[in-house]
Amino acid sequence: MMKNLNGRAHNACYHPYLHQLHQAQQLQHQQQQQQQQQQQTQLQQTPHAAHTQQNGLTQNAQPQIQWPYNSSAAANQYYQQQQQQQQQEQQMLRQRQLPTQQPAASYEQQQQQPQQHQHLQQQQQQHQLRQTFTNAATNTNAAAMAAMCQMQNFFTQQQQQQQQQEFNNNCVHINYNQQQQQQPTAAVATTTPTQKATPTKTTPTNNPTTTTNNSTTTTTTNGDKFAMDASEIASFLASELFMQQLGTFDGIQSAPTLTTPTLTPTTLRSIEETFFEMTNDAPYQAGFKPPPLAPLVNNNNNNNGNGNGNGNGNGNVLASSVVPTTTTTATIIGVSNPLISQQQQQQQQQVFDCGASVMPGSDTEESNGSWADGQMNEDQSISDTSSGATDSTSYQNGHMMGNSGGGNGGGTGGANNFSNVLAAAGRNTNTSNSATPARRGGGRRPNRSANMTPEEEEKRRIRRERNKQAAARCRKRRVDQTNELTEEVELLEKRGENLKKEMELLNETKNQLEYFLQAHRPTCQKVRADMLSVTTCNGLIGPPALLSAGSCGSGSSHHNNNSNSNDSSSGTITGLDATLNSTGRSNSPLDLKPVPIDEDLLLHIKDEPLDGALDSSSSLDQDGPPPHKRFALPNIATLMTPTGPAGSLQTPVSGTAPHGFGSFPTTISNISNISSIHNGPTLNSLNKMPKERPNTLAFQRPFGGQMQLSGSGRAPTQIQGVPIQTPSTGTFNFDSLMDGGTGLTPVSGPLIPNCTSQNKHPLELPTPTTEPSKLVSL
């Protein structure tokens, strides 16, 4: 039993084949020795006598080319060619040996000892011949070389073909090898170097004689030796593939096929199918799979396959016992032998078919036909259909397995059986196409209709028709539903695409509008309301307005100052004058209630000096409205401050007004008190708290010269017609300073402001509080 196809491990069945090879090699060497002795005896004769003898044998040769009679150099060249040819034959035979068994190796060593002795004798004889024939002409030597080359090429081709056929056929007779080797050497011995074109025409005629001994109908010549039919080509390729696969033992290739691929189970199966398609007609071609056939067994196995030298190990024991054949080579059904012609194979096939029909223990054609008819009737009533190609292939494989398996029990005469190895490889590697029927997954179990009445068959037919119609309706409904869903999906996709396009258009429009707004903003004449609004608390400016006022420009504020308004309900002051350089005064009259002041408590105060840094051309001097747009306060005795929910302020009012507030110290604490007033308690509660005031004010008198002119020695009671009423008992807070309730502002007469009485900036305004540490002294 073989373990693999690479030839690494093989069975002892190869031993007979090795012995046959050694015997053939020994006989060949003996024949070569005899031929050399004959050649030596012929060379002792004169070349003229040899030439006359050869002319008597070959009178029909072409007389165009003549050889010289005394051509010693040609004879020497001829024997050199023969020696080289013999050495090549010996090398090829050594390569075809299988040195894997130790007994075979020892036997080979025993056979090589006489071969070496013969080789030494041949070399000595050649040396003597070279010394005798050394005086040859140059032209005769060239002609002899050409003739010898042609002869050598032809003989090497013939010998290679014969040796390859000998190795492919495992049980070839030794007599066949002797005939094939004797005839070319005999032609060499009888042919002298006096002809050039004669060997190419005479020697091929000997080749058909060798092949007709084995196959009586095969005739091959040099012209049609490549004319092969389909079966011969298939068999040749199969044998080449198989021998290359099995002949590789430790780097030694038996068959020199360098272009053939590796033998695989797929190639084996395809080769088997090709053999059966071309050479064997299957008895059953109905398209279904028959049951596995029993192996063919013959009672004459012991007579034909009992391990003799020519024994058969195949499954065609019946054919070998019925038909007398001239050769005993392996002829399995579907495996063509290169030594047997196609007609002889057809005859054997016909006889084998006839014998198979009467073979005891095998299925006859009638029984198989009846079984096939019954199977067809059953399959007609069953809706299950099978593949004809697969079933026929599996049937052919199973048929071959049966034939090859039957021959294995006959004997072990055929050592290296090609068909048996193919069958074993196909059986081991191909499990899907085995002889057992493969079960198909799913489906209904076939019901046999043999025991059914016609009524039951009609009911089954009607039921199957209904099932078919229901299945068709189900398929149609499924297709319709699929189409509806597909259409709905397409509509939704289109709607989504439209929405995406609309979104893109809207985004483009938005981007364009934003670009237009950004481009129009620097040139727009309208001002946004959020940029002009100022947060107020009870008529007071809040911290956000103060912080934003410093960042806004005041270049054009004096042009639109008349549009300012104090909206105490909303808490914002709107207008273009965002800096509020007009100190937040409103155009409405102030409602202030005067408080009676004791004149005895008035102290002398110094006049406030004018701010020299401010002139009439400065921008801070002209923060207020122009003179022609200014108007005086109404002459009323009581002024009410619009403080909203905080109530009115009880601020004492004086008849004199200060010249300006530019000298008030400005601190960050005073500015931060604005936010505390905004978020702290109301102003009325702050005004009721007790406060401390200084008795004097650290101010310079602006009009000291006029006051010195008064000779009375007392301080003047008025300055430029404005009476001085100091000190006042009122509380000076932010509202009183902004609205004029300082006690120095006359309420009886009109108030005519001048440039020095305006504020420089809201940030410079003091913010007196009720805290003792933050009192403001005037």
Swiss-Prot record:
**Localization terms from the record:** Nucleus
Record-listed Phosphoserine modification sites: S588
Query: According to the UniProt record, where is the region Disordered?
Result: 24-57, 76-130, 183-223, 294-320, 356-414, 427-478, 550-594, 756-778
List the Pfam families: bZIP_1
Q: Does the keyword Metal-binding apply?
A: no
Compositionally biased residues, Gly residues: 403-414
GO MF, one example: DNA binding
Q: Where is the composition biased (Polar residues)?
A: 99-108, 427-436, 579-589
SMART domains per the UniProt record, alphabetical: BRLZ
Which spans does this entry mark as compositional bias, Low complexity?
24-54, 77-98, 109-130, 183-222, 382-402, 550-571
Cellular-component GO terms for this entry = nucleus
Query: Region Basic motif: start and end of each range?
Result: 459-478
Q: Where is the stretch described as Leucine-zipper? A: 485-513
Where is this protein primarily located? nucleus
PROSITE patterns recorded for this chain?
Answer: BZIP, BZIP_BASIC
Q: Which GO terms describe its biological process?
A: embryo development ending in birth or egg hatching
The UniProt keyword set, sorted, is: Activator, DNA-binding, Nucleus, Phosphoprotein, Transcription, Transcription regulation
Residue ranges of the bZIP domain? Answer: 457-520
What binding partners and quaternary form does the record give? Homodimer. Heterodimer with Jra. The kay-Jra heterodimer binds more stably to the AP-1 site than either of the two proteins alone.
Question: What family is this?
Answer: Belongs to the bZIP family. Fos subfamily.
Briefly state the protein's biological role: Developmentally regulated transcription factor AP-1 binds and recognizes the enhancer DNA sequence: 5'-TGA[CG]TCA-3'. May play a role in the function or determination of a particular subset of cells in the developing embryo. It is able to carry out its function either independently of or in conjunction with Jra.
This chain belongs to the protein called Transcription factor kayak
